[in-house]
């Protein structure tokens, strides 16, 4: 028994040391990539964003700025007055299941834009949340497969949003001439001005909270409830 416990202790010590060395090496391999660039106002007037697994943040800024932090490869180019932004899995990561607890898997793309600069914004998101705040936008398209969509303190005209497993939350915003559809998840509108807009939900509730006395909207859900509350 004595030799057994000694052998077991030696195994545990060497296994632990090897694991720490491997995780430390693997952590360095997943080095965070950073991108930070500003663009001139006349460089483009349309933006197309196609993300696989990156969190997206869009907010107001004094100049158009793109920032990225994460371990994906970020691809950015301008084609025919359209800024195209996309991400893809870095080749250095491989495709094996990540067993390293030291690896932080958070990837964030932040875009700052001045008011009235962009004529059209297209967003396609795979597995990551979409958060839009404090912006004025016309002709916006959002397609999301998995990850919540949040719109706050914004003015959106002609918004076309279609999301799958993506709860959608709109608060303190002006929404007009828009179509918003959720396949699975909550659709919530709070303290917002709504004009000539349609809200659809296949599997989930539609909730209007703290709404003004005049709301020009149509709402329908296949499986769920529609609740409406005026601002008190």
For every predicted segment, state its role.
Residues 1-125, 131-144, 150-163, 169-174, ...:
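Acidic (Asp/Glu) and glycine-rich low-complexity loops/linkers
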Residues 186-232:
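Extracytoplasmic/luminal low-complexity segments enriched in Pro/Gly and acidic/polar residues
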């Amino acid at each position: 028994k004595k030799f057994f416990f000694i052998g077991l202790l030696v195994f545990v010590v060497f296994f632990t040391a090897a694991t720490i060395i491997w995780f430390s090496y693997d952590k360095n391999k997943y080095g965070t990539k950073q991108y930070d660039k500003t663009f001139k106002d006349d460089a483009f007037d349309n933006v197309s964003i196609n993300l696989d697994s990156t969190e997206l943040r869009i907010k107001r800024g004094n100049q158009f700025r793109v920032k990225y932090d994460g371990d994906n490869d970020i691809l950015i180019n301008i084609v025919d007055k359209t800024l195209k932004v996309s991400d893809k899995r870095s080749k250095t990561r491989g495709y094996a299941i990540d067993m390293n607890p030291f690896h932080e898997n958070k990837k964030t793309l932040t875009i700052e834009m001045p008011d009235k600069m962009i004529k059209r914004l297209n967003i396609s998101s795979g597995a990551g949340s979409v958060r839009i705040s404090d912006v004025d936008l016309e002709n916006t398209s959002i397609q999301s497969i998995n990850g919540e969509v949040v719109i706050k303190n914004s003015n959106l005209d002609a918004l076309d949003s279609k999301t799958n497993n993506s709860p959608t939350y709109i608060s303190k915003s002006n929404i007009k001439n828009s179509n918003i559809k959720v396949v699975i998840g909550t659709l919530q509108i709070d303290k917002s001005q709504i004009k000539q807009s349609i809200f659809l939900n296949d599997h989930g509730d539609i909730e209007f909270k703290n709404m003004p006395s005049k709301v020009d909207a149509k709402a329908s859900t296949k499986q769920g409830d529609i609740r409406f509350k005026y601002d008190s």
